[in-house]
Amino acid sequence: MLWYNPVKIKKEIFIILKNTDGNNVFAKIPFGVIQASNKINQYLLPTYLYLAVNKNIFGEVKTSVRSIREEYINTANRTYWHEDEFYEALIVLTSNIIDEENNSIIDNLIDIKNFEHLSQMELQYNSSKNLNTSSDFEAQIKNLVKEFDAETDYSLKKKDIIISINSFQTGKGFVKCSYQEYNLFRNFQSFLKKNNSRISICQAINAYYTVKFIIKRNEALINLGLAKKNCSDQVSKSLFKKECCFADNTAKCVLQILKSMNLIEVVNNPKKENDYYIRLNKNINESETQQ
């Protein structure tokens, strides 16, 4: 079962999709979205995933910023909690994001009806500055989108919006989200709410697909002869923390959640104390090397 939560339909309505293989490709997530979600705005990947999922089910997306927010924020009684971040995530997804060397990070992945002009924006951030925390990157993006707030008058948050998903260059790399994975995250959100977890479902989603992204990238480097074969199916502790911008305690908590969902395995490094490797659970994850 998968969920859909348009504004005018009561929340928690479930749609039964018959004859669906849980390991079929459900959504393709560009590498750039995963990296930008860790370094620019932690809601980029969850927002894109929400839009792609509903597009695949219904053929179109009619939603609102509040609808997206309600799927991922634990504090249900705070109506506008983190709404600005989801608004900014939509702005970023419509835009073309480049780094200081003009390398493309994201290329206009969505279009918003009546706001198509936003897709012409080119936002540049300097990755050589403020590398310590993701909030520093978010602050840069906040400054970049301020000038557009007056023009749009936050109307993206006030009413339903129709969003189209643009195709992206698969040559830049992507990972897959299956029905099975998506349902695991959707169901686990209820557990996090009941247990008042300090870890958000957004952090868990970002961390999991970052692990998939690193492993997929390793496979590509091995095929090019640029990496050792023994590193293809695992991610080191240091690389995981660096890519996710996590402190030690946060990394441990997130990994514990992903382990409890049976999405990953954590293996101690026999050569180094307090070190570990992260591997995907083979029972849930199919190899992507053939895709």
Task: Kindly label every feature range from the protein language model.
Residues S104-L123, N268-Y276:
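Short, Lys/Arg-rich nucleic-acid/phosphate-binding segment
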Residues T79-N96, F246-I257:
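Short amphipathic alpha-helical interaction segments
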Residues I97, N108, N262:
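Glycine-centered, phosphate/nucleic-acid-interacting loop/turn motifs that mediate DNA/RNA or nucleotide
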Residues M1-N74, D84, E88, I105, ...:
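Short recognition helix of helix-turn-helix/winged-helix DNA-binding domains
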